[in-house]
Curated annotation (Swiss-Prot):
It comes from Xanthomonas oryzae pv. oryzae (strain KACC10331 / KXO85). ATP binds at residues 3, 160-161, 202-208. Pathway: Amino-acid biosynthesis; L-proline biosynthesis; L-glutamate 5-semialdehyde from L-glutamate: step 1/2. It comes from the Bacteria. Signal peptide: none annotated. This is Glutamate 5-kinase. Residues 267-348 form the PUA domain. It catalyses: L-glutamate + ATP = L-glutamyl 5-phosphate + ADP. The keyword Amino-acid biosynthesis applies. Keywords: Amino-acid biosynthesis, ATP-binding, Cytoplasm, Kinase, Nucleotide-binding, Proline biosynthesis, Transferase. Gene3D superfamilies: Acetylglutamate kinase-like, PUA domain.
Length: 362
């Protein structure tokens, strides 16, 4: 899996430039020639659209304007990648809902698997044209990590505009030292993350480390490297790392639990009492309506939501899971016994609000 940010593809005067993309394409070609399958997650559609209508939208404009630029630029982005390869390049656009909904998540995995079987090169981007602001994935670093787990990748390579992770931001601190090997993403390591230094993309070093943590939970190592350096990219094409290696977690969680932990969450939560919290955390139980005290948001049956403990100290997140009932229904059956559900609602989807198989503790 290769993730390429817009700062590596955007030309100084607007639009897309093949300057750095060529070297990255050679890295891709070297891996394909070695018999490896590869998927690209590529930003750059908005930057490409801005060149088509250079005075239309400024950086930081409302989302509808950025969506229009993404629609204009997506074809240009795919054309940029296609020019480097003889094999077909497949455009795959994903949204928050595609990864939050389990059935659509599995369908995306099947589609990507078939594209790879057919010898195509999938190029993935967030579908900025239709994503609404509150449901945007936010950055392609995290998208790349989730997709890396989805396709069961061996490694995630993140091309950036600096040489990897440093002990401090090298642009502002001359004493910053590069970190070649990161065995574990500790709080101290996360504190070293600085900004991207670019107004083109949305992901800084912090998001790259968050992505590495997501990939690591699936047993996938992450490599951060300077995509602007031809020497570094050529070394990578020869399997010689020049950058930062971030090790995978020692314990790989099961695929479904990974999805439950890392899929985008709906803007909502189920609120539970201390008894329910103890049953979930200590006994591995399912969540029953008797332990529910309320619901926040307007989620639907089948949505991924947070499960939060509400007590005298406030609220804190305990778990995530797939709700068997909508927020409206949960407010009606809260504090009720499971056998009362059908009498209250007129129907029942089962005795559990969230089944233990659809729940992961945080």
């Amino acid at each position: 899996m290769l993730k390429v940010g817009s700062s590596l593809l955007a030309a100084d005067g607007g639009g897309l430039s093949p300057r750095f993309a060529l070297g990255l394409a050679q890295f891709v070609s070297a891996n394909l020639a070695a018999g490896r399958e590869l998927v690209i997650v590529s930003s750059g559609a908005v930057a490409a659209g801005r060149a088509i209508l250079p005075k239309a939208v400024d950086v930081g404009a409302p989302i509808a304007a950025r969506q229009a630029l993404a629609a204009l630029g997506q074809a240009q982005l795919i054309a940029l990648w296609q020019r480097f390869f003889e094999r077909p390049v497949a455009q795959v656009l994903l949204t928050h809902d595609d990864l939050r909904n389990r059935r659509r998540y599995l369908n995306a995995r099947a589609t990507l698997g078939e594209l790879l079987r057919l010898g195509a090169l999938p190029v993935i981007n967030e579908n900025d044209t239709v994503s609404v602001d509150e449901l945007k994935l936010g950055d392609n670093d995290n998208l790349a990590a989730i997709v890396a787990a989805l396709v069961d990748a061996d490694a995630l390579f993140i091309a950036t505009d600096i040489d990897g992770l440093y002990s401090a931001d090298p642009r502002s601190n001359p004493l910053a030292r590069p970190l070649d090997d990161v065995p574990e993403l500790t709080p101290e390591v996360l504190a070293m993350a600085g900004g991207s230094g670019s107004n083109v993309g949305t992901g800084g070093m912090r998001t790259k480390l968050e992505a590495a943590a997501k990939a690591g939970a699936a047993g996938i190592e992450t490599y951060l490297f300077n995509g602007r350096s031809g020497e570094v990219v050529r070394a990578l094409a020869q399997d010689r790392l020049r950058g930062t290696r971030i090790h995978a977690a020692r314990t790989r969680i099961a695929a479904r639990k990974y999805w439950l932990r890392h899929a985008p969450v709906e803007a909502g939560a189920i609120l539970v009492d201390a008894g329910a919290a103890m049953a979930l955390s200590d006994k591995g139980a399912s969540l029953l309506p008797g332990g529910v005290v309320g619901a926040e948001g307007d989620f639907r049956r089948g949505d991924m939501v947070e499960i939060r403990l509400r007590d005298d100290e406030g609220e804190r997140c305990l778990a995530r899971g797939v709700s068997q009932y909508s927020a409206v229904d949960i407010r009606r059956i809260a504090r009720r016994h499971s056998r009362e559900i059908e009498n209250v609602l007129g129907y029942s989807y089962g005795e559990n609000v969230v089944h233990r198989d659809d729940l992961v503790l945080l």
